[in-house]
Amino acid sequence: TGTIAFLLKLKSSYSFVDALTRAHSMDEDIWKGLMANWHGIDVLLSPDQPAHGVDLQSDATGVLQFAGMIYELVVVDTNVPFGPWALSIARQSDELLLVTTNELSCLQAAQKALAYFDRNRVERSKVRVVVNRFSKDVGLSQEVIEAALHTEVYHTIPSDYETISRSLVEGRAAPSATPVGKSIQQLVEKLTGKAIRSESPKPSSLTNLFGFLRR
């Protein structure tokens, strides 16, 4: 959807679609040419124009395997859990974050996603349920979510509309001193098993993540 490019103020003439079309002849020089760079981090962006049919027809295995040979850690953001494209990513992933909210309609969608993974033999053990925009005062409780999904909630990210809205307007990630920023940092530490060392007094949570990736 272009969110990463918007948040990081990145532009590139290439996207993951170019990586897919060159997957069989990919080498490190071609790969580096496709990347946008943000503070030393390689970012493979989505195309400026919607890539019709990619989610249904493509397989990300070759691209992910190549990326895995270059980097210690690869983060992939996909918009839907269904179809060969999403399944190829799920099967290649060591850990799979299923992001939902505590609204009833989103919980139903999460149930469908988990059932789809089960039918297609994606190991349930690597699925991590993350509840975004969570509020104890509004919506379903964590206990209800866990009972409905038959799995534990791995992490909750608090509802923090004001911080997120300001960050989007300013084109930056949520500061790590805010509730949502702290929660994202905690999620990164849980996934990596390593504490993040702050490199400046007021870093953003996304900067902390990329700081870890650089090490």
Regions inferred by a protein language model and the residue ranges of each:
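Phosphate-binding loop that captures ATP/GTP phosphates
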Residues: 1-43
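Phosphate-binding/switch loop-helix module in NTP-utilizing enzymes
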Residues: 46-86
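Conserved C-terminal guanine-recognition region of P-loop GTPase G domains, centered on the G4
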Residues: 107-126
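Beta-strand-loop-alpha "switch" segments that mediate conformational coupling across diverse proteins
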Residues: 133, 145-174, 184
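NTP-binding/hydrolysis catalytic cores, primarily Walker-type P-loop NTPases
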Residues: 169-215
